[in-house]
Structures are given as C-alpha cells and as structure tokens.
Swiss-Prot record:
<feature type="binding site">
    <location>
        <position position="8"/>
    </location>
    <ligand>
        <name>CTP</name>
    </ligand>
</feature>
<keyword id="KW-0547">Nucleotide-binding</keyword>
<dbReference type="GO" id="GO:0001680">
    <property type="term" value="P:tRNA 3'-terminal CCA addition"/>
</dbReference>
<feature type="binding site">
    <location>
        <position position="21"/>
    </location>
    <ligand>
        <name>Mg(2+)</name>
    </ligand>
</feature>
<comment type="subunit">
    <text>Monomer. Can also form homodimers and oligomers.</text>
</comment>
<dbReference type="GO" id="GO:0000287">
    <property type="term" value="F:magnesium ion binding"/>
</dbReference>
<keyword id="KW-0067">ATP-binding</keyword>
<dbReference type="Pfam" id="PF12627">
    <property type="entry name" value="PolyA_pol_RNAbd"/>
</dbReference>
<comment type="similarity">
    <text>Belongs to the tRNA nucleotidyltransferase/poly(A) polymerase family. Bacterial CCA-adding enzyme type 1 subfamily.</text>
</comment>
<feature type="binding site">
    <location>
        <position position="137"/>
    </location>
    <ligand>
        <name>CTP</name>
    </ligand>
</feature>
<dbReference type="GO" id="GO:0004810">
    <property type="term" value="F:CCA tRNA nucleotidyltransferase activity"/>
</dbReference>
<dbReference type="GO" id="GO:0005524">
    <property type="term" value="F:ATP binding"/>
</dbReference>
<dbReference type="InterPro" id="IPR012006">
    <property type="entry name" value="CCA_bact"/>
</dbReference>
<dbReference type="InterPro" id="IPR006674">
    <property type="entry name" value="HD_domain"/>
</dbReference>
<keyword id="KW-0460">Magnesium</keyword>
<dbReference type="GO" id="GO:0004112">
    <property type="term" value="F:cyclic-nucleotide phosphodiesterase activity"/>
</dbReference>
<feature type="binding site">
    <location>
        <position position="91"/>
    </location>
    <ligand>
        <name>ATP</name>
    </ligand>
</feature>
Amino acid sequence: MRIYTVGGAVRDRLLGLPVKDRDHVVVGSTPEAMVQLGYRPVGKDFPVFLHPVTHEEYALARTERKTGKGYKGFQVHADPEVTLEQDLARRDLTINAIAEDEHGNLIDPYHGVADLHAKVLRHVSPAFCEDPVRILRVARFAARFVEFSVADETMTLMRHMVEDGEVDALVPERVWQELAKGLMEQRPSRMFEVLRACGALKRLLPELDRLFGVPQTAKYHPEIDTGVHVMLVIDYAARAGFSLPVRFAALTHDLGKGTTPAHILPRHIGHEERSVELLQSLVKRLRVPNDCKDLALLVAKHHGKVHQVGEMKAATVLRFLQETDALRQPGRFRDFLSACEADARGRTGFEQQALPLFPLLLEILQLVRTVDAGAIAREQSSPDAIKEAVFSARVAAMEAAYRFPLKEAVG
C-alpha cells in the first residue's frame, strides 16, 4: 500500500498558497484492508475513507469510464492494480494532477508543474470532455488564479463540448454549486468571461449572456456595455468582501436591460420590472437558495430608487424603507445597500464615488425602529388608525432628527 497527497493541496503548496484541504490517493489496497486499518468508509459512488485521526480523505486509486451524458454518467473501477498514473489521468487539469509521496517527491506525469510556472489551465487528456462540470471548474479556477489563462486546446475542447450539448445535461444544483463558488473567488468576472468564450454562458445563463453588447447611456455608464458593467459590479463586490447573496444580487440586478426594446436604447425604461421577471425564472431553474433569491429580487426591483432617496420627503423615504421590508429585516437591507454600492461603483471612473446617503439611510432606519409602535397601537381604536398613527410618529421622528430632502443634509 502506497499513499500520495494529490490535487489542490499539492497545487496550492507549490503556488505558495495556504493549504486548506488535503486529499490522498491510496495505491495497492482494498476497501477491506482500509477498514481493518481503522479508516471509516464514506464514499457512496467510489471507495473514499476518512483517516481515523486526521479525518482527511483517502480514496483508493481508480479509473472512470463514460457510460452516459452528464457528470453522473460514469462507471468507476477501483482495484489494487490501478496505478497512480492511471488515477491522475482522470483528473481535470494538469495543475490538479500532481502527486506527492511521503518524502516530498513529486510525481508529475502530465507536466502540471510546468503549467503552474507558465500559468496555464490545461486539460490532462481527451477524457476531459466526458464530464461537463469541468467546464464550470475551469471557469472557476480562472476566477481564482487570475494570472492564469486557459490553454487554446482546452478552450477548443470546451467549445466542442458545448456544441455537442454536454452542458445541457448538467443538473441545476451542480450548476448553482459551481457558480456560487466562482462568485466567491478573487475575480468572479473571469469565470463568466471563460463561460462566454466557450459558449456555455449562453446555454446556462442566457439572461446574463444577452447583456453583452447592449448599450447604456454614456453619461451614467462610461463603460457603455451592460455586460461589462455587470462584470465590474461583481468584481467590486468581490474586492469589498461582500457575501454570496450580495454578489449574486450584483450579478443579476440588470437582467432586464437585455430585453430592452431596441428603439429606446440606450435608455432602459422599466428594466427593473423586466429584471424581476427574468430573475424569477432563473432562480427557479437553478434552484437558487432563498437567501440569494430574496435579496436578488429585492435589488433587481429597487436598486434604481435608492439613488432618488436624496430628493424624497421624509414620508417617501419611510415608504421606501417599508417597500424594501427594512424595518423587519434590517440585516437584509444592509445587504441591499451593499449590492447598490457595488452597482454604483462598478462603473468606469466611479470606483471611488462617495455614497453619503447610504450610511444616512441606515441611521434613519435605526431611528425609525426605535419608535414604540406597540405603545402607539394601544391608544388607537382600529387597525387603520394604528397604521396611520405609527407612520406619522415615525415621520415625525425622522423630521425631528434630519433635514429633508436629504440631499441638503449631505451637501
């Protein structure tokens, strides 16, 4: 029995990055032998075990054979006769197909070290095309390793996979899983650039793909292209360290601009409503989790109005806080403002734009939530009277503390 560290742990160590998870391949063993040594079996589809002390994953060396479409259409063969080189051959990229033995010696049959030095994402073998998830993984690695480029022959293979309909067989949960990981990488825009370059974006996220080439008013969007704007927005969200729900909302806030009637371009009247409609279909199709879905819909619907707050009377500002459910969900409202911040600063030349109204809105929200609605309600005789009295008390508190319209308060 021989044990090797493989995959991301070896890759990241060679890149000088922190090693998070360590995976191992075991050559020349059987499931029975692993159990006898105290390893705990956890693999459902192939033999994977947890170390009795470290709880790191140890997988028996295996080969895979394509038996059908999609990422589940595989037959796995694990056997003591399977060699390390055979196991590494089934990996997606050369930089992930490097092994290290217990003495620190590298086993690199597919020249992954050379590709690390050259900063190239290259497929190990033609078997790459058997698993469409690998297209998403390559795109995600491009977002993580921002100095790496996709090898020409790998991009060509990915295009052929898309043309052959392989990505159409992907299950929604797996698409979302990879997109979510990619959005949390260093430069998410690179994931979508790679997916667009190979044609996968049009198949997986047509609502996003059609934004590229759609013009916006140059005065407000010097970058002009709506798709370029969205890429700037998600990269700003990444630099700011915003959460996944905020990044997903940033990605999808302008989907409606892709269906703006040509005769009104570069204006996008009513794009918020169209964005909501497209987004409802997208989140249902990909089975997006509720926290991401709810924030994205909120941002798509209201992101334009937040920039009008400075012109509003106190009562109108309060209605805006009610429309966004800020009083009941202040944490989500903060996330809403974060996505709007990314939208405002994700524009060429506006990266450092001051947004004084945003912290002011949070102050006003905090003030409004201190108004004792319960005490006011006890003095009223009907639900309508309660609603009106509470609203009036909140407006009075706002006007006592701030000068409206707020644009005068912030200069």
